[in-house]
A protein has these predicted regions:
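Short loop/edge segments at beta-strand edges and connector loops
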Residues: 36, 74, 103, 181-184
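Glycine-rich, N-terminal phosphate-binding loop of Rossmann-like dinucleotide-binding domains
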Residues: 52-53, 133
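Short acidic low-complexity segments
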Residues: 31-44
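Short, Asp-centered acidic motifs that coordinate Mg2+ and/or phosphate
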Residues: 10, 48, 128
Length: 197
């Protein structure tokens, strides 16, 4: 998508062949830097990073960037443990750098329209809300995005990645949840797990 006021200055990926494709496509003026080492990229003169790496790496990579003096836009979710969340918050507070989690679901056209109506006052005050996010995928599609049992998507409880469901209510109403309850149906045996936080 087009975004004014920004310039793609550097890209980091563990796979050099991917970097070559990106450089060929986006290095229009010959200044795009490419790195296979994230720490080396952080030494460069860039202002901010966009983290689109694996879920379980987000907090570590964000904290490194903040401590290197970079602003951070992180794909969701921000962390995989409470301890990582605390460390991430501390890094933001200590560095004074801007951090944003890039939860995209609240910014779809439908949710933006609901927010407009809610902000107008037509709906009144929100006292209770429910949200859901259903993303059914075939086994082949699931394997494409999570190949193998050791892929991060297969190593976390499903409710750890609940941002699509809850972020839309938080954004529309500009509120924080008091209590959250969730369950994950199991397609294979139709059982489910319930989590409450």
């Amino acid at each position: 998508a087009e975004c004014t006021g920004l310039k793609l200055a550097a890209v980091c990926d563990r796979r050099p062949e991917k970097l070559a494709v990106i450089k060929a496509k986006y290095d229009t003026d010959g200044t795009l830097m490419t790195f296979t080492d994230y720490d080396e990229m952080l030494k460069s003169d860039i202002d901010a990073v966009i983290l689109a790496n694996y879920f379980n790496e987000h907090a570590e990579f964000a904290i490194k960037a903040l401590r290197a003096g970079k602003h951070v836009l992180s794909e969701c979710t921000a962390m995989s443990t409470l301890a990582e969340g605390v460390a991430l918050c501390r890094a933001v507070e200590e560095t004074g750098k801007i951090y944003m989690i890039a939860e995209n679901y609240p910014y779809t056209k439908q949710r933006l329209e609901i927010k407009r109506v809610y902000d107008s006052g037509e709906l009144g005050e929100m006292l209770y809300g429910e949200a859901e996010y259903c993303h059914p995928m075939s086994n082949n599609t699931t394997f494409k995005y999570a190949p193998g049992e050791y892929h991060w998507r297969n190593q976390i409880p499903s409710t750890y990645y609940c941002t699509h469901a809850i972020a839309q209510i938080m954004h529309i109403t500009d509120t924080m949840p008091v209590r959250v309850n969730g369950f994950v149906p199991r397609i294979k045996d139709q059982s489910y797990r319930e989590y409450e936080y």
